[in-house]
Amino acid sequence: MKKNFLSMMKRSLMAISAVVAMGMVTASLTACSSSDDESEKELAKVKEYLAGNEWTVNSTRGTYSYYKNHMVLYENGGGLTPGGYVIEPDVAFGYWQMDGDKLTTRFEVGRPEGFNIKNLLNETISEVHLQESNKITGSRVSVSIDMRPLIVGTFANGNECQMRCGSSLNDISDETEHDGALRGTWYSGISISDSPDKTYVGSMTFNEDGTMHMVIEGKQDFTTTYSTRNGKVTINGYLVKDHVATFYYQNLYGSLIKLYSCENGYMSSIWRKNKEEIYQ
């Protein structure tokens, strides 16, 4: 009887130990899962904060505009000299991606000729996260405190990268293959070589399903397709049928879109929401 009792007690203790061990494993897995979820939430916040805003990097000159459609635009300088000469700004177009806590920025084309885009933020930054900031600026009569967080990471050489938020871009672009920033009908004045003294009204209507209706009054009227990726649009019939063209693009305040050459970064054309404005 005593043997049976001891045997039963032993089996019970072993069962309890197994349950406790299982509980410890479950608790450990739950803790890891919770930690991973928090990390993913923080990285989602970084991405949401980054896209749609203009940024400066450390103490370097120029601004980096990160768009929701994954285009990145760099701008610096420009203006007029005291003598009235135009100083052309440095401009570059590229794309950005986030993979975990790594932010990659790559520039593909810049202007003017001779502007070295390799000197820009053109690499992968690791360990990207948000960091509190209290930047104080002011004068004798007023003080301003910028409490917006920094985006901080590590360059490939081990140095720290600090990105400070500037202006909002009023960005309505998105990551889809048919970017909402292009959708709708846009108008432009078109010159044709066989009628150099006449300006024709052209229109492009971009639809959500990836089709685009191209019209040049009295000259062209056809439907084609388009796709968008990383701030570039490929139109499988631009101005004339079967002429495939790819551009960087910007939607400015919903009133116009600008198309930029992927070869040299210069503006190719402007298309306006208001048809009457094409003659201004």
Regions found by a protein language model. Name each.
Residues 1, 32-33:
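Terminal processing/anchoring signals of secreted or surface-associated proteins
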Residues 27-31:
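C-terminal motif of bacterial Sec signal peptides marking the signal peptidase cleavage site
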Residues 34-93, 99, 104-223, 227-280:
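Lipid interaction determinants
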Residues 10, 14, 18-26:
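Hydrophobic helical h-region of N-terminal Sec-dependent signal peptides
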Residues 1-10:
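N-terminal secretory signal peptides that target proteins for export/translocation
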